[in-house]
UniProtKB/Swiss-Prot annotation:
One of its GO terms (molecular function) is cobalt ion binding. Changing residue 267 to A: Reduces expression at the plasma membrane. Does not affect H(+)-coupled Fe(2+) transport. It comes from Rattus norvegicus. Residues 1-45 are annotated as: Disordered. Inhibited by 2-(3-carbamimidoylsulfanylmethyl-benzyl)-isothiourea. This is Natural resistance-associated macrophage protein 2. Ubiquitinated by WWP2. N-glycosylated.
């Protein structure tokens, strides 16, 4: 729907920030031509607990830096960083070390830096507009593309949830010395999710502190493994800062691509843009907005530095201890250590292949039972923390895209059911190798969903009607465009490699049809993104059918006078 300048928007009331949003129009007009937000009345997210409380920012005279203010803004970045430490990332890390040694640490560093820059865009969108990414997508895209985009993001969230369930189930199985079967661990994760989700009833800061506690557990457990194995520090530094991969072949290249897919999570853009709304920022004051952007970026830098160090711990442990090890060598060590898991590995001369489960077993064989149990505790912390942030992501995405308010209980029931059923079937009817093998497929799935977060975040943060003076400059636009192109190229590589392994004509046909539909939708989003980046000649005077217009009518989001229209 495109409104004439004289046409009035029905006064539906406030549209989305649930708090200090009345001042948004003073600095940030945003537009919509496909649909307008439906009001929820005077209620303030009645089913959501996360935004029931907003953290006040201490008032001080302006200074370049204040530790008090940084502490007040600390929280969202560490919750966001959980996605960089989920079981899928841990599995990617250990496989990277076992397959390529220290050679791919620079890829991990580069992927983390790229992730940081993308999180910066997500946080800025939430701070400047008072809306998270899903809400902005709801206001901008027409109905059909909006629904498709929502389904793609939900698919990414469910895939991530499956990884968390798998990781938690394996950790419980290891901690119980196999007494709790894998399907039992899967069922336990259903119950513990509800327990942990009640924590935010005790206050936002306590919830954020609990996440900090889980990150600390991961740092201590994986740090213990690092100290125990004693990897070569010179090799670690060389792998981190020298971008090369001598002697690398297809497995190493595929692993490098897998690192990118594991580190940069699509749903994390939606999550971070929503989490920053938990701080009280007067968006009518440009100085406060700039200050919030600065402190959120500093916090994100600290949080992702911590997550990077933890990931380096895991890569280095497996690079030092298990790079180029054979199954025969591992079996011999496990038998000498009287490990009950010696039969887990084939007694042949092929290169050792590890996953989350086997990784814990070989650590126990080489460095004692303590290493196995401490590894399992770290994996459990990774799975549980990711479970909670995944639930928040799902809630924000559903509420934003569909303007639908669900209780968190109902939301967990839905997503957990979808994630649990296939995972439970594999756990019951297959072995642990098939269960952990799902992580590789799910990392590919996450990578394929990346454009559905990267393109919208780049589009909207580049639009001046949305971001006012905080829109992306030419440098960010060029860098973002190159990044999206690179990610899409990586995805196509993933698709080609994966399809080649299918080995069946019917599957080739299905893959071809899905690939065409996938690329078509990515092209659609990319087209709109290029117009937003300034290539207005692409709109051909007809882009209003797509959701972007050469002269988009905009309205002041969340203002009391919702009928006021202005034109760019």
């Amino acid at each position: 729907m495109v409104l004439d300048p004289e046409e009035k928007i029905p006064d539906d009331g406030a549209s989305g920030d649930h708090g200090d949003s009345a001042s948004l129009g003073a600095i940030n007009p945003a537009y919509s031509n496909s649909s307008l937000p439906h009001s929820t009345g005077d209620s303030e997210e009645p089913f959501t607990t996360y935004f029931d409380e907003k953290i006040p920012i201490p008032e001080e005279e302006y200074s370049c830096f204040s530790f008090r203010k940084l502490w007040a803004f600390t929280g969202p970045g560490f919750l966001m960083s959980i996605a960089y430490l989920d079981p899928g990332n841990i599995e990617s890390d250990l496989q990277s070390g076992a397959v390529a040694g220290f050679k791919l640490l620079w890829v991990l560093l580069l992927a983390t830096i790229v992730g940081l820059l993308l999180q910066r865009l997500a946080a800025r969108l939430g701070v400047v507009t008072g809306l998270h990414l899903a809400e902005v997508c709801h206001r901008q895209y027409p109905k059909v593309p909006r629904i498709i985009l929502w389904l793609m993001v939900e698919l990414a969230i469910i895939g991530s949830d499956m990884q968390e369930v798998i990781g938690s189930a394996i950790a419980i199985n290891l901690l119980s010395a196999g007494r709790v079967p894998l399907y039992g661990g899967v069922l336990i994760t259903i119950a513990d999710t509800f327990v942990f989700l009640f924590l935010d009833k005790y206050g936002l800061r306590k919830l954020e502190a609990f996440f900090g506690f889980l990150i600390t557990i991961m740092a201590l457990t994986f740090g213990y493994e690092y100290v125990t194995v004693k990897p070569s520090q010179s090799q670690v530094l060389r792998g981190m800062f020298v971008p090369s991969c001598s002697g690398c072949h297809t497995p190493q290249v595929e692993q490098a691509v897998g690192i990118v897919g594991a580190v940069i999570m699509p749903h994390n853009m939606y999550l971070h843009s929503a989490l920053v709304k938990s701080r009280q920022v007067n968006r009518a004051n440009k100085q406060e907005v700039r200050e919030a952007n600065k402190y959120f970026f500093i916090e994100s830098c600290i949080a992702l530095f911590v997550s990077f160090i933890i990931n380096v711990f895991v890569v280095s442990v497996f690079a030092e201890a298990f790079f180029e090890k054979t199954n025969e060598q591992v079996v011999e060590v496990c038998r000498n250590s009287s490990s009950p898991h010696a039969d887990l590995f084939p007694n042949d001369n092929s290169t050792l292949a590890v996953d989350i489960y086997k990784g814990g077993v070989v650590l126990g064989c080489y460095f004692g039972p303590a290493a196995l149990y401490i590894w399992a505790v770290g994996i459990l912390a990774a799975g549980q923390s990711s479970t909670m942030t995944g639930t928040y992501s799902g809630q924000f995405v559903m509420e934003g895209f569909l303007n639908l308010k669900w209780s968190r209980f109902a939301r967990v029931i839905l997503t957990r059911s979808i994630a649990i059923i296939p995972t439970l079937l594999v756990a019951v009817f297959q072995d642990v190798e098939h269960l952990t093998g799902m992580n590789d497929f799910l990392n590919v799935l996450q990578s394929l969903q990346l454009p559905f977060a990267l393109i919208p975040i780049l589009t909207f943060t580049s639009l001046r009607p949305v971001m006012s003076e905080f829109s992306n400059g030419i440098g960010w636009r060029i860098a973002g465009g190159i990044l999206v192109l690179l990610v899409c190229s990586i995805n196509m590589y993933f698709v080609v490699v994966y399809v080649q392994e299918l080995g069946h004509v019917a599957l080739y046909v299905v893959a071809a049809v899905v690939s065409v539909a996938y690329l078509g939708f990515v092209f659609y989003l990319g087209w709109q993104c290029l117009i937003a980046l300034g290539l207005s000649f692409l709109d051909c005077g007809r882009s209003y059918h797509l959701g972007l217009t050469a002269r988009p009518e905009i309205y002041l989001l969340n203002t009391v006078d919702a009928v006021s229209l202005v034109s760019r």
